[in-house]
Regions:
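Hydrophobic/aromatic beta-strand patches that form the interior of the parallel beta-sheet core
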Residues: 32, 60-62, 116, 148, ...
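Short, conserved loop/helix-junction motifs that constitute active-site signature segments
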Residues: 53-56, 140, 179-180, 207
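Charged helix-capping and loop-helix junction motifs
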Residues: 45-47, 129-136, 168-170
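Core catalytic region of metal-dependent phosphoesterases/phosphodiesterases
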Residues: 2-6, 11-98
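His/acidic metal-ligating clusters that form di-metal
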Residues: 26-27, 92-161
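Active-site environment of divalent metal-dependent phosphoester hydrolases
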Residues: 10-15, 39-41, 66-71, 121-123, ...
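Acidic, His/Gly-rich catalytic cores of divalent-metal-dependent hydrolytic chemistry
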Residues: 162-251
Protein backbone atom coordinates (compact mmCIF):
# COMPACT_ATOMS: atom_id res chain seq x y z
CA UNK A 1 0.00 0.00 0.00
CA UNK A 2 1.22 3.47 -0.86
CA UNK A 3 1.04 6.16 1.78
CA UNK A 4 0.89 9.81 0.67
CA UNK A 5 2.80 12.11 3.02
CA UNK A 6 1.50 15.67 2.82
CA UNK A 7 2.63 18.53 5.03
CA UNK A 8 2.25 22.27 5.43
CA UNK A 9 -0.89 22.64 3.35
CA UNK A 10 -1.32 26.21 4.59
CA UNK A 11 -4.91 26.62 3.40
CA UNK A 12 -3.84 26.35 -0.25
CA UNK A 13 -6.85 24.78 -1.95
CA UNK A 14 -5.33 24.66 -5.43
CA UNK A 15 -2.12 22.97 -4.28
CA UNK A 16 -3.87 20.46 -2.02
CA UNK A 17 -6.40 19.54 -4.71
CA UNK A 18 -3.60 18.93 -7.21
CA UNK A 19 -1.63 16.81 -4.75
CA UNK A 20 -4.64 14.68 -3.82
CA UNK A 21 -5.39 14.03 -7.49
CA UNK A 22 -1.75 13.21 -8.25
CA UNK A 23 -1.40 10.90 -5.23
CA UNK A 24 -4.53 8.94 -6.05
CA UNK A 25 -3.47 8.61 -9.68
CA UNK A 26 -0.15 7.16 -8.47
CA UNK A 27 -1.71 4.54 -6.24
CA UNK A 28 -1.97 6.20 -2.85
CA UNK A 29 -4.36 4.21 -0.68
CA UNK A 30 -3.83 6.10 2.55
CA UNK A 31 -2.92 9.65 3.55
CA UNK A 32 -0.88 11.22 6.35
CA UNK A 33 -1.30 14.96 6.92
CA UNK A 34 1.72 16.21 8.84
CA UNK A 35 0.38 19.47 10.23
CA UNK A 36 -0.03 23.14 9.39
CA UNK A 37 -3.29 22.61 7.60
CA UNK A 38 -3.97 26.35 7.84
CA UNK A 39 -2.15 29.68 7.91
CA UNK A 40 -1.06 31.94 5.02
CA UNK A 41 -3.49 30.63 2.37
CA UNK A 42 -6.93 31.82 1.34
CA UNK A 43 -9.07 28.67 1.82
CA UNK A 44 -8.73 27.44 5.42
CA UNK A 45 -12.32 26.20 5.80
CA UNK A 46 -12.20 24.12 2.61
CA UNK A 47 -8.83 22.57 3.51
CA UNK A 48 -9.90 21.71 7.06
CA UNK A 49 -13.08 20.09 5.74
CA UNK A 50 -11.11 18.01 3.22
CA UNK A 51 -8.66 16.84 5.88
CA UNK A 52 -11.48 16.04 8.28
CA UNK A 53 -13.12 13.91 5.58
CA UNK A 54 -9.85 12.07 4.93
CA UNK A 55 -9.43 11.40 8.64
CA UNK A 56 -12.94 9.95 8.76
CA UNK A 57 -11.81 7.61 5.97
CA UNK A 58 -8.76 6.46 7.94
CA UNK A 59 -6.10 9.10 7.28
CA UNK A 60 -3.62 10.19 9.93
CA UNK A 61 -3.40 13.89 10.80
CA UNK A 62 -1.27 15.70 13.38
CA UNK A 63 -1.17 19.23 14.71
CA UNK A 64 1.23 21.86 13.35
CA UNK A 65 2.30 25.12 14.94
CA UNK A 66 -0.13 27.16 12.82
CA UNK A 67 -2.97 24.79 13.73
CA UNK A 68 -2.02 25.16 17.38
CA UNK A 69 -1.94 28.95 17.05
CA UNK A 70 -5.50 28.91 15.71
CA UNK A 71 -6.57 27.19 18.92
CA UNK A 72 -4.44 29.05 21.49
CA UNK A 73 -3.65 32.32 19.72
CA UNK A 74 -0.55 33.46 17.77
CA UNK A 75 2.79 32.98 19.48
CA UNK A 76 4.82 36.14 20.26
CA UNK A 77 7.65 34.73 18.14
CA UNK A 78 5.50 34.57 15.00
CA UNK A 79 6.22 37.06 12.26
CA UNK A 80 3.70 39.76 11.51
CA UNK A 81 2.38 38.12 8.33
CA UNK A 82 1.90 34.79 10.10
CA UNK A 83 0.13 36.44 13.03
CA UNK A 84 -2.21 38.40 10.76
CA UNK A 85 -3.01 35.25 8.79
CA UNK A 86 -3.74 33.30 11.99
CA UNK A 87 -6.16 35.95 13.27
CA UNK A 88 -7.92 36.13 9.91
CA UNK A 89 -8.06 32.35 9.59
CA UNK A 90 -9.70 31.94 12.97
CA UNK A 91 -12.50 34.27 11.84
CA UNK A 92 -13.13 32.03 8.81
CA UNK A 93 -13.64 28.75 10.69
CA UNK A 94 -16.82 27.56 12.35
CA UNK A 95 -17.04 25.85 15.74
CA UNK A 96 -16.78 22.34 14.30
CA UNK A 97 -13.70 23.20 12.24
CA UNK A 98 -12.01 24.83 15.24
CA UNK A 99 -12.85 21.78 17.37
CA UNK A 100 -11.29 19.49 14.75
CA UNK A 101 -8.02 21.46 14.84
CA UNK A 102 -8.05 21.53 18.65
CA UNK A 103 -8.41 17.74 18.77
CA UNK A 104 -5.47 16.98 16.48
CA UNK A 105 -2.73 15.00 18.26
CA UNK A 106 0.85 16.22 18.42
CA UNK A 107 2.08 12.90 17.09
CA UNK A 108 0.87 9.45 16.05
CA UNK A 109 2.59 6.08 15.85
CA UNK A 110 1.52 3.24 13.58
CA UNK A 111 3.28 0.34 11.83
CA UNK A 112 6.79 1.34 13.02
CA UNK A 113 6.14 4.89 11.77
CA UNK A 114 6.09 8.13 13.73
CA UNK A 115 4.05 10.99 12.30
CA UNK A 116 4.80 14.43 13.77
CA UNK A 117 4.88 17.99 12.53
CA UNK A 118 8.27 19.28 13.65
CA UNK A 119 10.41 16.65 15.40
CA UNK A 120 10.34 13.62 17.68
CA UNK A 121 12.31 15.08 20.60
CA UNK A 122 9.88 17.91 21.45
CA UNK A 123 6.74 17.80 19.31
CA UNK A 124 5.07 20.66 21.20
CA UNK A 125 8.12 22.91 20.96
CA UNK A 126 8.01 22.99 17.15
CA UNK A 127 11.79 23.25 16.82
CA UNK A 128 12.99 23.06 13.21
CA UNK A 129 15.15 20.28 11.83
CA UNK A 130 17.59 22.54 10.05
CA UNK A 131 20.35 20.02 9.57
CA UNK A 132 21.93 16.73 10.56
CA UNK A 133 22.31 17.61 14.25
CA UNK A 134 18.58 18.16 14.81
CA UNK A 135 17.72 15.20 12.59
CA UNK A 136 19.88 12.82 14.64
CA UNK A 137 18.42 14.21 17.87
CA UNK A 138 14.97 13.44 16.48
CA UNK A 139 15.89 9.92 15.37
CA UNK A 140 17.43 9.14 18.77
CA UNK A 141 14.17 10.23 20.43
CA UNK A 142 12.04 7.46 18.86
CA UNK A 143 12.21 3.69 18.45
CA UNK A 144 10.24 3.89 15.20
CA UNK A 145 12.12 2.99 12.04
CA UNK A 146 10.46 5.73 10.02
CA UNK A 147 9.79 9.29 11.14
CA UNK A 148 7.71 11.51 8.87
CA UNK A 149 7.59 15.21 9.65
CA UNK A 150 7.02 18.60 8.09
CA UNK A 151 7.64 22.13 9.38
CA UNK A 152 10.67 22.57 7.12
CA UNK A 153 9.24 23.58 3.76
CA UNK A 154 12.01 21.99 1.68
CA UNK A 155 12.28 18.25 0.91
CA UNK A 156 15.02 16.40 2.80
CA UNK A 157 15.92 12.87 3.85
CA UNK A 158 18.08 11.75 6.79
CA UNK A 159 19.14 8.31 7.99
CA UNK A 160 20.90 6.71 10.93
CA UNK A 161 22.67 3.35 10.65
CA UNK A 162 22.88 0.70 13.34
CA UNK A 163 26.49 1.72 13.97
CA UNK A 164 25.49 5.34 14.57
CA UNK A 165 26.59 6.67 11.18
CA UNK A 166 24.39 9.56 10.03
CA UNK A 167 23.59 10.67 6.52
CA UNK A 168 21.51 13.28 4.73
CA UNK A 169 20.21 13.57 1.22
CA UNK A 170 18.45 16.13 -0.97
CA UNK A 171 16.06 14.02 -3.05
CA UNK A 172 15.22 14.35 -6.72
CA UNK A 173 11.52 14.35 -7.64
CA UNK A 174 10.13 11.07 -8.93
CA UNK A 175 13.19 8.95 -8.09
CA UNK A 176 12.45 5.91 -5.93
CA UNK A 177 14.68 5.56 -2.87
CA UNK A 178 14.89 2.23 -1.02
CA UNK A 179 14.62 2.84 2.73
CA UNK A 180 16.83 -0.01 3.91
CA UNK A 181 15.48 -1.86 6.97
CA UNK A 182 18.80 -1.75 8.87
CA UNK A 183 18.58 2.03 9.27
CA UNK A 184 16.30 4.60 10.84
CA UNK A 185 14.88 7.20 8.47
CA UNK A 186 13.58 10.74 8.84
CA UNK A 187 11.52 11.92 5.87
CA UNK A 188 10.64 15.57 5.29
CA UNK A 189 8.40 15.70 2.20
CA UNK A 190 8.45 19.51 1.86
CA UNK A 191 5.46 21.82 1.77
CA UNK A 192 2.33 21.18 -0.25
CA UNK A 193 0.93 24.68 0.12
CA UNK A 194 3.98 26.93 0.41
CA UNK A 195 7.26 25.49 -0.95
CA UNK A 196 10.33 27.54 -0.11
CA UNK A 197 13.07 26.21 -2.37
CA UNK A 198 12.48 28.56 -5.30
CA UNK A 199 10.09 26.16 -7.03
CA UNK A 200 6.38 26.94 -6.53
CA UNK A 201 5.26 23.41 -7.46
CA UNK A 202 3.63 21.58 -4.56
CA UNK A 203 5.66 19.00 -2.64
CA UNK A 204 4.64 15.67 -1.16
CA UNK A 205 6.05 12.14 -0.91
CA UNK A 206 4.83 8.59 -1.57
CA UNK A 207 5.97 5.70 0.61
CA UNK A 208 5.26 2.12 -0.44
CA UNK A 209 4.94 0.33 2.88
CA UNK A 210 5.25 -3.08 1.21
CA UNK A 211 8.44 -2.52 -0.78
CA UNK A 212 10.00 0.22 1.38
CA UNK A 213 10.38 2.52 -1.62
CA UNK A 214 10.04 6.27 -1.08
CA UNK A 215 9.62 8.89 -3.80
CA UNK A 216 9.43 12.65 -3.48
CA UNK A 217 7.00 14.36 -5.83
CA UNK A 218 6.57 17.85 -7.27
CA UNK A 219 3.15 18.76 -8.61
CA UNK A 220 2.56 21.90 -10.70
CA UNK A 221 -0.73 23.60 -9.90
CA UNK A 222 -2.55 26.85 -10.62
CA UNK A 223 -0.37 29.03 -8.42
CA UNK A 224 -1.79 32.20 -9.99
CA UNK A 225 -5.27 31.23 -8.79
CA UNK A 226 -3.94 30.46 -5.31
CA UNK A 227 -2.20 33.84 -5.18
CA UNK A 228 -5.37 35.58 -6.34
CA UNK A 229 -7.34 33.91 -3.52
CA UNK A 230 -4.87 35.27 -0.98
CA UNK A 231 -5.01 38.76 -2.48
CA UNK A 232 -8.82 38.87 -2.30
CA UNK A 233 -9.57 36.88 0.87
CA UNK A 234 -9.84 39.85 3.20
CA UNK A 235 -6.37 40.02 4.66
CA UNK A 236 -4.57 43.33 4.97
CA UNK A 237 -3.62 44.25 1.39
CA UNK A 238 0.09 44.63 2.12
CA UNK A 239 0.27 41.33 3.97
CA UNK A 240 -1.81 39.59 1.30
CA UNK A 241 0.48 40.79 -1.47
CA UNK A 242 3.58 39.57 0.35
CA UNK A 243 2.01 36.15 0.88
CA UNK A 244 0.85 35.99 -2.74
CA UNK A 245 4.35 36.77 -3.96
CA UNK A 246 5.81 34.05 -1.78
CA UNK A 247 3.55 31.51 -3.48
CA UNK A 248 4.44 32.74 -6.93
CA UNK A 249 8.17 32.67 -6.24
CA UNK A 250 8.28 29.53 -4.12
CA UNK A 251 9.80 31.19 -1.08
Amino acid sequence: MKLALISDLHANREAFSAVLEHARAHGAGRFALLGDLVGYGGDPAWVVDQVRELVQQGAIAVMGNHDSAIVTGPLPTMREDARDAILWTRSQLDAAQLAFLAALPMHREADDCLFVHANAFDPQGFEYIQGRLEAMRSLHATQCRYTFCGHMHEPKLYHLSGTGKAGEFVPSPGVEIPLLPNRQWLVIPGSCGQPRDGNPAACYALFDMTTGLLSYQRVPYDVDAAAARVRHCGLNETVAERLAQRLLQGE
